[in-house]
């Protein structure tokens, strides 16, 4: 196994990415995937690497969110199976189709979602409950997350908050489900590719595991309005940046 010279830096990237993801419920996969892609790692290997690390970081994060009671059991169950199925299908497709063909549509969706989230803060609209749309959301998010190497939290968390779910439960539940989605995606890609950058996986998960408990504590103490605003801003920036990058 070849150890990349960027490993020490990737530990810091893993810490920062998980801190953002644990506090705001998004950003880990996207941030880590962007770095690996910049380093020239192929999309399928990038997705496998990030999801392998995410199995550990999401596991620690899920336990932390459960401790602080940030998980909504009903929403968790509605997202779980569809999310796993979507992840497996997306991983299978990624092994044969370039990811860049679908990324522009993902970024456009995120831009629209961010505006919905921010409008709820400004207009103070009445919260909505996540009902039958939960399974569809999980399936779509799991599929796109596998294709792009990340994005589950960005799609699921922002959509749930846009529908009126309290940020702490949207973030905690999203982090809990991604553990299973990441595991399914990682195993699917590993079985089809037969290779993975274990040195990068280790670097990302060391940094991420250290940040997870801190992020869960912050989530349970941040006011709902502030957390919602943060989610909207982060999604807008990620969406705008990603769309601009893919179209230029």
Per-range role (PLM):
Residues 1-22, 27, 31-43, 64-151, ...:
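Juxtamembrane transmembrane-helix boundary motif
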Residues 13, 23, 56-58, 180:
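Accessory recognition modules or surfaces
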Residues 49-64:
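Transmembrane alpha-helices of multi-pass small-molecule transport proteins
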Residues 50-54, 174-178, 200-201, 205:
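Short hydrophobic/aromatic, small-residue-rich stretches within specific transmembrane helices
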Residues 54-55, 119-124, 179-181:
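Short acidic/polar alpha-helix capping motifs at helix-coil junctions
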Residues 169-188:
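Hydrophobic alpha-helical transmembrane segments of multi-pass integral membrane proteins
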């Amino acid at each position: 196994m070849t150890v990349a010279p960027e490993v020490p830096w990737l530990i810091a990237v893993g810490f920062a990415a998980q801190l953002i993801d644990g506090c705001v419920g998004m950003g880990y996969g996207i941030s880590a995937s962007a770095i690996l892609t910049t380093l020239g790692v192929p999309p399928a290997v990038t997705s496998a690497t990030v999801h392998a690390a995410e199995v550990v970081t999401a596991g620690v994060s899920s336990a932390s969110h459960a401790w602080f009671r940030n998980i909504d059991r009903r929403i968790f169950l509605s997202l779980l199976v569809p999310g796993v199925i979507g992840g497996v299908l997306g991983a299978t497709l990624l092994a044969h189709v370039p990811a860049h063909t679908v990324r522009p549509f993902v970024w456009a969706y995120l831009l629209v979602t961010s505006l919905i989230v921010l409008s709820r803060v400004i207009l103070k609209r009445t919260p909505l409950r996540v009902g039958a749309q939960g399974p569809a959301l999980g399936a779509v998010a799991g599929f796109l997350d596998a294709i792009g190497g990340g994005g589950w939290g960005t799609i699921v968390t922002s959509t749930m908050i846009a529908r009126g779910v309290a940020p702490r439960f949207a973030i905690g539940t999203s982090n809990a489900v991604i553990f299973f989605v990441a595991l399914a995606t990682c195993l699917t890609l590993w079985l089809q590719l037969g290779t993975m950058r274990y040195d990068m996986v280790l670097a990302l998960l060391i940094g991420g595991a250290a940040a997870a408990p801190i992020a869960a504590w912050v989530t349970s103490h941040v006011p709902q309005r502030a957390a919602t605003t943060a989610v909207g801003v982060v999604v807008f920036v990620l969406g705008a940046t990603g769309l601009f990058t893919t179209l230029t």
